[in-house]
């Protein structure tokens, strides 16, 4: 029968094989075609690395199946894995190691079962069948290990309309994951969602654990309006500044925009609207500040109790 072998460069090789061929045999055929020594080849199918002595039939590899060929780099490399407790583990790996392999190495060192491990790199959760090379993880890169809590937990998400959504999550879920769950329930695209907890806007690549969001915590969902709006900021000297903002911008964001325009550090700014001083972690929407509203900027004098 015919099978296909796809390399990391995207090239696809066609091989004539039999179900009874061993993985060694397949590697020898690849060497004949491509000149790559078998000891530098790793073959992956359905997220599993294939062992030399086993047959294609053992792995249920049928006609026109596609295997993935990853090159085994000579000598390997070190990477670091940082846990939520701050401990750093050093691992000896190769670029061609799959995430499963890495989790197995962590289990060997730390005793944590792979099914309780979530690995994060550059804000992305790593999938078991992919390789370190797939994620461009290079020597001395640092991965973050989050424990997958058995059974998960419930959190609440409150919208500006007052509706409360209940979500089943785990501490190791990223903010991206949470936004995807909200999309599943409410149909709101993630790029229109801003999530706020304890006055902070939550960043996509971080986890609930990073923000100490625990069971039955309540997040606030603010919709990111496409295109935004203009508001005005009036100073005590009578000058009026125009800002481009979104309802979901926090007061911190607005102060940063004022700093960009006027050079006034945020810690010297006080913003007043409708007679109220605005708090940094809250959003414009929280204060019902709409397009063409006018805020008043008062400077906070250094050293004073004002």
Swiss-Prot record:
Propeptide: 305-306
Ranges for domain Ubiquitin-like: 1-76, 77-152, 153-228, 229-304
UniProt subcellular location: Cytoplasm; Nucleus
Biological process (GO), any one: response to UV-B
InterPro entries: Ubiquitin-like_dom, Ubiquitin-like_domsf, Ubiquitin_CS, Ubiquitin_dom, Ubiquitin_ubiquitin-like
Major localisation: cytoplasm
GO cellular component, one term: nucleus
Pfam families reported in the protein's UniProt record: ubiquitin
GO molecular function, one term: mRNA binding
Stored Gene3D superfamilies: Phosphatidylinositol 3-kinase Catalytic Subunit, Chain A, domain 1
Keywords: Cytoplasm, Isopeptide bond, Nucleus, Repeat, Ubl conjugation pathway
Cross-link (Glycyl lysine isopeptide (Gly-Lys) (interchain with K-? in acceptor proteins)): 76
Signal peptide boundaries: none
Cited PANTHER family: UBIQUITIN
Function according to Swiss-Prot or TrEMBL: Ubiquitin exists either covalently attached to another protein, or free (unanchored). When covalently bound, it is conjugated to target proteins via an isopeptide bond either as a monomer (monoubiquitin), a polymer linked via different Lys residues of the ubiquitin (polyubiquitin chains) or a linear polymer linked via the initiator Met of the ubiquitin (linear polyubiquitin chains).
Family: Belongs to the ubiquitin family.
Additional detail: Ubiquitin is encoded by 16 different genes. Ubiquitin is generally synthesized as a polyubiquitin precursor with tandem head to tail repeats. Often, there is one to three additional amino acids after the last repeat, removed in the mature protein. Alternatively, ubiquitin extension protein is synthesized as a single copy of ubiquitin fused to a ribosomal protein (either eL40 or eS31) or to a ubiquitin-related protein (either RUB1 or RUB2). Following translation, extension protein is cleaved from ubiquitin. For the sake of clarity sequence features are annotated only for the first chain, and are not repeated for each of the following chains.
Name the record gives this protein: Polyubiquitin 3
Source species: Arabidopsis thaliana (Mouse-ear cress)
Gene: UBQ3
């Amino acid at each position: 029968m015919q099978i296909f072998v796809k390399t990391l460069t995207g090239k696809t090789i066609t091989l004539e094989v039999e179900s009874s061929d061993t993985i060694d045999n397949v590697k020898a055929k690849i060497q004949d075609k491509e000149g790559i020594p078998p000891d530098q080849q790793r073959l992956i199918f359905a997220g599993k690395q294939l062992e030399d002595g086993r047959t294609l039939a053992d792995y249920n590899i049928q006609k026109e199946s596609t295997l993935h060929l990853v090159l085994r780099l000579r000598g390997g490399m070190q990477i670091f894995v940082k846990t939520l407790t701050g401990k750093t583990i050093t691992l000896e790996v190769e670029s061609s190691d799959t995430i499963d392999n890495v989790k197995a190495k962590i289990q060997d060192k730390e005793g944590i079962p792979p099914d309780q491990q979530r690995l994060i790199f550059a804000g992305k959760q790593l999938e078991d069948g992919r390789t370190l090379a797939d994620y461009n993880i290079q020597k001395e890169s640092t991965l973050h290990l989050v424990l997958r809590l058995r059974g998960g937990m419930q959190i609440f998400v409150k919208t500006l309309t007052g509706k409360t959504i209940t979500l089943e999550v785990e501490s190791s879920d990223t903010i991206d994951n949470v936004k995807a769950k909200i999309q599943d329930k409410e149909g709101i695209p993630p790029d229109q969602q801003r999530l706020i907890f304890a006055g902070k806007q939550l960043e996509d690549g971080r986890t609930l654990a990073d923000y100490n969001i625990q069971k039955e915590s309540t997040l606030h969902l603010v919709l990111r309006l496409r295109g935004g709006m203009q508001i005005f900021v009036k100073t005590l000297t009578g000058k009026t500044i125009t800002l481009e903002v979104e309802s979901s911008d926090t007061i911190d964001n607005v102060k940063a925009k004022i700093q960009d325009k006027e050079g006034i550090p945020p810690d010297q700014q006080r913003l007043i609207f409708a007679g109220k001083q605005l708090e940094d972690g809250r959003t414009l929407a929280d204060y019902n500040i709409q397009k063409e509203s006018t805020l008043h900027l008062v400077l906070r004098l250094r050293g004073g109790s004002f």
